[in-house]
């Protein structure tokens, strides 16, 4: 059996845009040819795409860094550099992508073929043909390509199943799945025989079908990490109906009703919304001695918790080993599924607000910040300013002068004066230093 991996931490980096080119038209019989440098190509984006053939996040165990290629540089004759192809990263259905730093959900990928641009490629820098004006018909200005986005991500796989089997270890969940579907889970007479989720397709005699997941057994304290802990509790989140399997024979020496209460407490502690899912109680091992007496006591205790206006969960006595009582259980499960809508896995507050693709600067975006370093130099920072800086070709005087005009237009010079900067003070942006001229 292949190893199951349902969480992974990875980093992605989109490709940088290609640099624009400074070039001039030099052809015989064409006097004063003017600028002819083309734009750089767009950097490749990193795109997640759902592949229904994948079952785990195992591929991300050994490959944790994904980097798209940069765009090509601009060329002469005003030709654009070639844009890089996007990097397609395949993920299984049910993959939730979160920002590793904030923990916020970026996207939830559940449909086969669904795509999401997780890191946008940088745009290509403009060539000098773009900067020609009547006042400067032969500019020696070109932009560097824009850096691609970089992100640290957490991936979580929550299997897609209509029905989830929950219960203590060794209550018969794996046996139930094996007799109602073609799934072949590992079955044994010891705790935690099931250590990975198993998925099977169930078809009732009435013709209804649904996906059922056998999840590793829970024990008291699972929501705090005891036993297999929360490692597989996340897989219950996508289910619409929960089959709560109870060992009515009390073969492990536990009270069946206390088992029922304990497991529900773990579900509630892990995620309060899990108890919103309708449950069917599967009273298993009814072929064992004293099971009938235990079931009668169970029903009495359960009824005491509900008043006449509450909908008490249905109880189905079965024996998975003897294959008794299963048809009525499956029909009831199919009927409950038909009347139960999908549950919203995340609300709006769980999602991280993603910026739109926008190559200007939003009004809300803070243009720059000024701090003072230990060596008394002034340090400029800020997303807008740093983006302008990295796209400026510092090897060409005209580009540097253009950058200086941009800083002045942003109010950097005035802000430095207000902070007390004097003529000759050192100003730093990244690893680039220059003197402040008042």
From Swiss-Prot:
Pfam families given in the database record: DUF1967, GTP1_OBG, MMR_HSR1
Cofactor: Mg(2+)
EC category: hydrolase
Main location: cytoplasm
Molecular-function annotations in GO: GTP binding; GTPase activity; magnesium ion binding
Domain OBG-type G stretches: 161-338
Compartment(s) where it occurs, according to its Swiss-Prot or TrEMBL record: Cytoplasm
Enzyme Commission number(s) of this protein: 3.6.5.-
Keywords linked to the UniProt accession: Cytoplasm, GTP-binding, Hydrolase, Magnesium, Metal-binding, Nucleotide-binding
Residues annotated as domain Obg: 2-160
Ligand binding (GTP): 167-174, 192-196, 214-217, 284-287, 319-321
Annotated Gene Ontology cellular component terms: cytoplasm
Membership in a protein family: Belongs to the TRAFAC class OBG-HflX-like GTPase superfamily. OBG GTPase family.
Subunit structure of this chain's protein: Monomer.
Biological role stated in the UniProt entry: An essential GTPase which binds GTP, GDP and possibly (p)ppGpp with moderate affinity, with high nucleotide exchange rates and a fairly low GTP hydrolysis rate. Plays a role in control of the cell cycle, stress response, ribosome biogenesis and in those bacteria that undergo differentiation, in morphogenesis control.
Listed name of the protein: GTPase Obg
């Amino acid at each position: 059996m292949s190893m199951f991996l349902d969480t992974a931490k990875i980093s992605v980096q989109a490709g940088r845009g290609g640099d624009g080119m400074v070039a001039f038209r030099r052809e015989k019989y064409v006097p004063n040819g003017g600028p002819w440098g083309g734009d750089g190509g767009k950097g490749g984006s990193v795109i997640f795409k759902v592949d229904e053939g994948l079952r785990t996040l195992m591929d991300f165990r050994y490959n944790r860094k994904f980097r798209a290629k940069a765009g090509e540089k601009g060329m002469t004759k005003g030709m654009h550099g070639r844009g890089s192809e996007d990097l397609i990263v395949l993920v299984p259905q049910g993959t939730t992508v979160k920002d590793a730093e904030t923990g916020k959900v970026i996207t939830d990928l559940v449909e086969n073929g669904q795509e999401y641009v997780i890191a946008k490629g940088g745009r290509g820098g403009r060539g000098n043909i773009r900067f020609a004006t009547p006042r400067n018909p032969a500019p020696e200005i070109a932009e560097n390509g824009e850096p691609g986005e970089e992100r640290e991500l957490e991936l979580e796989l929550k299997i897609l199943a209509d029905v989830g089997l929950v219960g203590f270890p060794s209550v018969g969940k794996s046996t139930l799945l094996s007799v109602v579907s073609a799934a072949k889970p590992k079955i044994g007479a010891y705790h935690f025989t099931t250590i990975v989720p198993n998925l099977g397709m169930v078809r009732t005699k009435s013709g209804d079908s649904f996906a059922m997941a056998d999840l590793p057994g829970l024990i008291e304290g699972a929501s705090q990490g005891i036993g297999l802990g929360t490692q597989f509790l996340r897989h219950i989140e996508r289910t619409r109906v929960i089959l709560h399997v109870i060992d009515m024979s009390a073969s492990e020496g536990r009270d069946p009703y206390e088992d029922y209460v304990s497991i529900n407490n773990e579900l509630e502690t892990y995620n309060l919304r899990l108890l919103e899912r309708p449950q069917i109680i599967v009273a298993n091992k009814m072929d064992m001695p004293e099971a009938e007496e235990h079931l009668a006591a169970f029903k009495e205790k359960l009824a005491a918790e509900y008043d006449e206006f509450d909908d008490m969960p249905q109880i189905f006595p079965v024996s998975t080993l003897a294959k008794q009582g299963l048809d009525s259980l499956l029909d009831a499960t199919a009927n409950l599924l038909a009347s139960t809508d999908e549950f919203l896995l995340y609300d709006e507050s769980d999602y991280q607000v993603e910026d739109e693709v926008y190559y200007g600067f939003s009004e809300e975006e803070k243009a720059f910040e000024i701090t003072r370093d230990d060596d008394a130099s002034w340090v400029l920072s800020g997303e807008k300013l740093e983006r302008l800086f990295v796209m400026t070709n510092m090897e060409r005087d005209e580009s540097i002068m253009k950058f200086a005009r941009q800083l002045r237009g942003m109010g950097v010079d005035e802000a430095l004066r207000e902070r007390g900067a004097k003529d000759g003070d050192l100003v730093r942006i990244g690893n680039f230093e220059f003197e402040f001229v008042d």
